[in-house]
Amino acid sequence: VTAPQCVPSRAGLLSGRYQNRFGVESNAESVAPFAAERTIAERLKEAGYVTGMAGKWHLGDNTKIAEHGFDKVFFKHSNAPGFWNMDLEGKDIEPAEQRGGGYHLDLIADFACAFIKRHARQPFFFYLAPRAPHTPLDAPPKYTSRFPGEMPERRRQALAMISAVDDGVGRILATLREHKLEERTLIFVIGDNGAPLKIHKLDSPLPSDPGGWDGSLNEPMNGEKGTLCEGGIRTPWLAYWKGAIPGGQVFAHPVISLDVAATVVALAGLEIRPGELDGVNLIPFFTGENKAAPHERLCWRWTAQSAIREGKWKLLRGGPREYLFDLDADPGEKQNLLDTHPEIAKRLRDHLQAWGADLQPPGVESNSLGRAASNYFDYYLDGKPAARPAPAQESQEPAARREERNKRRGIQANQ
């Protein structure tokens, strides 16, 4: 994905452009620039598709999601009230705050099924965004009971929430099959960022420490959410299109969430200007028609961190720190080869700086390396003893103060 954090990662996914090009850099900054971007939904709507979304938004006002190209909206990411304009029977309702009963991960999948049933004879695009696994951890007993035995309670909750998502995906697939749409539907399943381990993976009592470990894991990758290590940006990615993409294969080359927009726009027959999107159409690569790698290089910038990958080589920077890894030989990013291959590091550094010149603001970093990121680099990359990272301390901030701060930044609370 394009960032080790949810807001910029989702902005990149839905726009098909590096979010750094339009100034959505991290969760801590305003998402206002995203409003000027054309989303996948807006593009497909112009091509005659009906569009829908359900779940977490996190890209601005939850009552204005429809303005980003979504015809049918079911914003709900917790057991608190949500906002939607179609009910679970597929009937239009007045857009307003709603208080539907049931577990939010079940409800968003049910909404997706209702959307598919209603629009089975039309071309459609649906964006399902479960908040799972993610704090606050809130799986009900019907899911936690599937994972008995001794384990951290936060781990049990994460597995339970993933199980709920899995059930929902199963219901969606069953609905597609019921309406004979399975061979006409391309499905991507992608994580938005790596697991937030907070180094120590503290199993603090629930529901305390809402900004703490969410029970997910990154092994065997190094790092976590908030770093441009593989553990922060390398997430699960599944592509399914029965009869078109051969099943059971592991694609050997790197891809990125930006490719989703480029792929679906190409399949819809829409024309785009050169450079308008940053991804590529993956279908020729997944089918084997094109044997090359989809990308010569991939780049990232997240606040004071930046990285570039070219084949097996990855250059990672964090403030004044710099690392070079051979990901084929060292997928856990443990051996810094900067001194061994200075010529490779220079080539990658030059490409990264050229890429950064087109960002907003320009450059390979947009902020200073904060305390939390410094702790992560100390522990994951420099082998220093683990310090308690800043995010866990920041989670003690009073909720009212945190929500007011988030409102000023254009971030909806509890997302």
Placement of each model-derived feature along the sequence:
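Formylglycine-dependent sulfatase
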Residues: 1-322, 329-350, 354-357, 361-367, ...
